[in-house]
């Protein structure tokens, strides 16, 4: 039964990854080896995925359209049921991060609206149920003592945290990637992991992005 469940799980993942493929681009596919493959989730936090989060006004429609919250949970659940390793790459800002001498436009915005704010690296004061905290329904999966929570990335990609090191130390060279947001942290993680020699597949309905007057971040991520 366990083997059957594992095969079903891998089939679902492959199907989900393949739901959005441009007709003129080849689909290289991915042979998933459970011994070498991990699920990586970027920013599964309230500020992105909760209606109370500071970005919900621009990401909410995309999250709902893709059933992102539910689909990320399905990834967590399936991974845990099949003993596939899970890594979470979170986004936190501490007080010292607000003292940067120069910032990009989105950094200014994130700091202005208090996105992912924490009191400090060594305290959980005011952390519970804050915008930086995990979405409540994900906590049983993330806080089970098995999920690897990396150090926080500060901008978009894993260049500023220890995700690559943690993956390599676990013998992982294949990554199934999901999380928030599609055209920023998720895409940046994808590109850097590929540059680092990992084989990466993105679950396209387990992510979402901002929709603003200038365009749809999710569509931009899929096209790129």
What are these regions (language model features)?
Residues 8-18:
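Bacterial N-terminal signal peptides
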Residues 23-38, 47, 65, 78-82, ...:
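Active-site-adjacent betaalpha module
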Residues 94-98:
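Short catalytic/ligand-binding loop motif for oxyanion handling, primarily in non-cytosolic enzymes
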Residues 1-8:
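Bacterial N-terminal signal peptides that target proteins for export
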Residues 35-37, 52-79, 84-90:
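A short alpha/beta connector and helix-capping loop motif
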Residues 51-60, 100-103, 193:
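Surface-exposed, active-site-proximal loop segments in enzymatic domains
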Residues 89-92, 180:
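Short, well-ordered beta-to-alpha junction loops that form the rim of enzyme active sites
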């Amino acid at each position: 039964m366990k083997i059957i469940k594992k095969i079903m799980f891998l089939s679902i993942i492959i199907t989900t990854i393949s739901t959005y493929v441009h007709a003129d681009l080849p689909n290289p596919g991915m042979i998933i080896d459970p011994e070498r493959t991990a699920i990586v989730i970027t920013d599964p936090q309230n500020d992105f995925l909760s209606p109370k989060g500071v970005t919900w006004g621009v990401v909410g429609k995309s999250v709902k359209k893709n059933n992102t919250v539910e689909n990320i949970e399905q990834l967590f659940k399936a991974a845990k049921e099949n003993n596939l390793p899970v890594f979470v790459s979170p986004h936190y800002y501490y007080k010292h991060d607000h003292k940067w001498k120069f910032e990009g436009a989105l950094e200014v915005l994130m700091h202005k609206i208090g996105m992912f704010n924490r009191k400090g690296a060594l305290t959980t004061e005011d952390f519970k149920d804050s915008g930086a905290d995990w979405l409540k329904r994900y906590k049983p999966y993330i806080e089970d003592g098995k999920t690897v929570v990396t150090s926080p990335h500060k901008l978009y990609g894993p260049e500023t945290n220890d995700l690559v090191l943690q993956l390599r130390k676990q013998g992982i060279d294949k990554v199934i990637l999901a999380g928030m947001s599609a055209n920023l942290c998720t895409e940046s993680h994808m590109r850097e992991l590929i540059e680092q020699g990992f084989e990466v597949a993105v679950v396209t309905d387990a992510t979402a992005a901002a929709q603003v007057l200038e365009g749809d971040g999710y569509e931009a991520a899929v096209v790129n």
